[in-house]
């Protein structure tokens, strides 16, 4: 493969085939391409607009080069991030609830542009985010929950870290996280930062051997189920791709004020989650329940979103004990107790 020819093709706004994109991604991730050319390729892809085939090819490369673990029937609740609103880490909270009934392989990273990534909030809760594969399998067996830190499970990505940081713009790698779970989670609730990317990412997901994925983008522009209005969804299964639009009031609840969901730090997010689990923050609790409801539908545990919401109400009642179990087996209970104390007021 001639990298310069690939670059010329992208500059001419021609899409790569899946095999071309996969080969290119492997070369980049392995550090075989000079940084100046990596920068040029990432910018050219962004300016052209990443195609489905390019996303699929890059995702396959990242999956192949990742440290892998086997977690049958797992669900992930990862999103693309990048919506810029800084809401509480609802996907992480939902993952904890889901682990009461199903294996959860939560793939995530530290925040890049926001206040708190999934790694940050779990660390604030006392969780040890570096979990080697053998330990990960043990934790799944004992707790139904494991966090797979992207930087640890995709070690070759360090070869592009400097370029990405220097560029300071969204590149194709920013949207690959939810598609590259190291446990090959077959079920997923996937938040998407832009409504315009729902179609592209749903078509990409369809090519990547998921059982069922629900991609969501919610008003007022978040990569979660909307707390205030409409959520635009793509439901991807073996049967194809279905488009759905759903309003928060369809759960039988009122809209949730967005300002009540904003956080300033990982600790702030951790406190809000624990307060919701304790029944002390109704707004955040509702936000967690509506997102969990859609994830339950992705798992085929319920037949509709309203039923999922009712199930989530039961799950959140058992969330504090589950969180304690998760941290006690892989973390620092002292940190969790500190958060609990700060949440009790």
Curated annotation (Swiss-Prot):
Q: What does this protein do?
A: Catalyzes the transfer of the phosphoribosyl group of 5-phosphorylribose-1-pyrophosphate (PRPP) to anthranilate to yield N-(5'-phosphoribosyl)-anthranilate (PRA).
- Record-annotated residues binding anthranilate 2? 164
Q: What UniProt keywords apply to this chain's record, in alphabetical order?
A: Amino-acid biosynthesis, Aromatic amino acid biosynthesis, Glycosyltransferase, Magnesium, Metal-binding, Transferase, Tryptophan biosynthesis
Write out the residues that bind 5-phospho-alpha-D-ribose 1-diphosphate: 79, 82-83, 87, 89-92, 106-114, 118
- EC number in record: 2.4.2.18
Q: What is this protein called?
A: Anthranilate phosphoribosyltransferase
SUPFAM superfamilies (UniProt xref): Nucleoside phosphorylase/phosphoribosyltransferase catalytic domain, Nucleoside phosphorylase/phosphoribosyltransferase N-terminal domain
Q: Which GO terms describe its molecular function?
A: anthranilate phosphoribosyltransferase activity; magnesium ion binding
Q: Where does Mg(2+) 2 bind?
A: 223-224
Q: Which organism is it from?
A: Saccharolobus islandicus (strain Y.N.15.51 / Yellowstone #2) (Sulfolobus islandicus)
What residues does anthranilate 1 bind to?
79, 109
